[in-house]
């Protein structure tokens, strides 16, 4: 006789509970189907500078001339597809779109903008530097790009739109902004939602133009930086705003050849703007790269700003390396250190150098040009004693204790006197001789150390956090010459480079 106890009819309340559980289970399953899948987000990811970057299929990322936007917890990256292209043929193929939740692992989503049979997006056309921003008022993603002929005579901007991040985008045409030339470009969206076009105008300089409310056209001119011409213009622009300060980044005009890229600052987009100065170690050509964008990674514990550049390989543009490095930004000083490896926690908004920074503890600093050591004059222990260069003598007045403050920022304390390397009166003037002073934690006693030369070497440039100037010896190889702060530049790179031991 079969056991029938498990088949008893449940009472009415039990039947209702059973039905409710079943219904909730079905609804839960349906909800899971309706919610779009997202990529898993790792707590921390590691970047290896100069390494090949690939997507989920192992294909080299085509994120050249990077455009990037974050939607929810996902970044969407846009780039020029340079696969198979060389400097002899840079004609348009397509604009790619990828997605990532950690900026290290990317999934190819498809072509955001495809080549057409004719017109601006047709064969033998130039389409460069795609930048995307979102217009909340119109619920539209807006892409700007450089549109040109192969001889770069048209110098226009193109505009495309989409209702979704990766598109496909609908091309809406091209124009010269306010009638001006426009080649390399960038976009900036201010905290109030107003958007701006950054545009290289060979006749005048780097333009900042306000976009219309729908972002589809240029409304008015805001500022022009530089004087125009090949020597007075800046291209490949990018911009961020931090605590009311605007920072614009860009490259000198040297074609496919790399150069020491520069930045300027202002508290208003209309200016006045500071003079342009290097943000990476002079002479390194921005560690072999050209500015493409600056990525803002805002998290629960802080905000990291990532310099994104292209290391162009003219024989294989599609294989050009993506050079992404964290920026150190303090006040009006921007510094880009060189880290062979570094880690990013995108959720926290924090980064850590894996290599490329010196160890804490006692070091000597030898000038690359003179081979002399940084020295407290006469072995003095007095506040205000001058800093000079002197042949190695083994004294503790030539030894400095490095203490890391944050990022690649250190203080240097004389082992003999216990006083800190200091810029007198917090001066921001080039040529001021350094001295030692009571340690007080001021930015005039903090130095960003930038690795130069070999990834495994120990040579650094030291940049004053307060002044943005470099520690050097004004090109002198004379015993007893003053150690001062210098403006920097590739011509004086050796006299501003120090080997730690």
Please place each PLM-identified region on the residue numbering:
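Compositionally biased, intrinsically disordered/low-complexity regions enriched for serine, proline
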Residues: 7-9, 33, 127, 234, ...
């Amino acid at each position: 006789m079969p056991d029938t106890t498990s088949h008893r009819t449940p009472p009415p309340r039990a039947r209702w509970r059973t039905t409710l559980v079943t219904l909730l289970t079905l609804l839960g399953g349906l909800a899971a189907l309706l919610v779009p899948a997202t990529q898993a987000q790792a707590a921390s990811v590691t970047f290896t500078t100069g390494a090949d970057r690939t997507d989920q299929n192992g294909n080299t990322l085509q994120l050249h001339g990077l455009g990037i936007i974050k939607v929810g917890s996902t970044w969407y990256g846009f780039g020029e597809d340079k696969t198979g292209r060389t400097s002899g043929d840079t004609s348009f193929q397509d604009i790619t779109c990828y997605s990532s939740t950690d900026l290290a692992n990317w999934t190819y989503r498809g072509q955001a903008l495809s080549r057409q049979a004719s017109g601006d997006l047709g064969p033998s056309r130039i389409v460069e530097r795609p930048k995307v921003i979102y217009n909340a008022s119109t619920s539209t993603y807006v892409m700007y790009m450089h549109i040109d002929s192969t001889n770069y005579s048209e110098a226009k901007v193109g505009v495309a739109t989409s209702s979704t991040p990766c598109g496909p985008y609908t091309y809406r045409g091209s124009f010269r902004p306010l009638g001006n030339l426009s080649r390399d470009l960038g976009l900036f969206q201010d905290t109030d939602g107003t958007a701006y076009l950054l545009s290289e105008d060979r006749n005048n300089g780097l333009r900042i133009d306000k976009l219309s409310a729908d972002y589809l056209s240029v409304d008015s001119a805001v500022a022009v930086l530089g004087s125009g011409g090949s020597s007075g213009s800046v291209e490949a622009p990018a911009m961020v705003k931090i605590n009311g300060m605007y920072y614009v980044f860009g490259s000198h005009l040297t074609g496919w050849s790399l150069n020491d890229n520069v930045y300027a600052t202002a508290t208003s987009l209309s200016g006045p703007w500071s003079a342009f100065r290097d943000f990476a170690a002079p002479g390194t050509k921005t560690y072999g790269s050209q500015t493409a964008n600056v990525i803002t990674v805002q998290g629960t514990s802080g905000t990291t700003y990532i310099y994104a550049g292209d290391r162009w390989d003219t024989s294989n543009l599609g294989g050009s390396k993506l050079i992404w490095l964290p920026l150190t930004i303090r006040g009006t000083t921007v510094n880009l250190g060189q880290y062979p490896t570094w880690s990013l926690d995108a959720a926290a908004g924090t980064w850590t150098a894996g290599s490329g920074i010196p160890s804490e503890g006692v070091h000597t600093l030898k000038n690359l040009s003179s081979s002399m050591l940084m020295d407290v004059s006469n072995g003095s222990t007095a506040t205000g004693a001058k800093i000079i260069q002197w042949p190695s003598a083994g004294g503790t007045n030539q030894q400095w204790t490095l203490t890391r403050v944050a990022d690649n920022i250190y203080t240097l304390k004389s082992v003999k006197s216990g006083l800190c390397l200091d810029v007198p009166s917090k001066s921001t003037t080039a040529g001021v001789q350094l001295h030692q002073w009571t340690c007080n934690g001021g930015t005039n006693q903090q130095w960003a150390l930038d690795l130069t030369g070999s990834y495994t070497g120990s040579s650094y440039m030291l940049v004053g956090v307060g002044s943005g100037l470099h520690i050097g010896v004004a090109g002198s190889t004379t015993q007893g010459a003053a150690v001062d702060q210098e403006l920097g530049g590739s011509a004086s790179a050796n006299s501003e480079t120090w080997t730690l031991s």
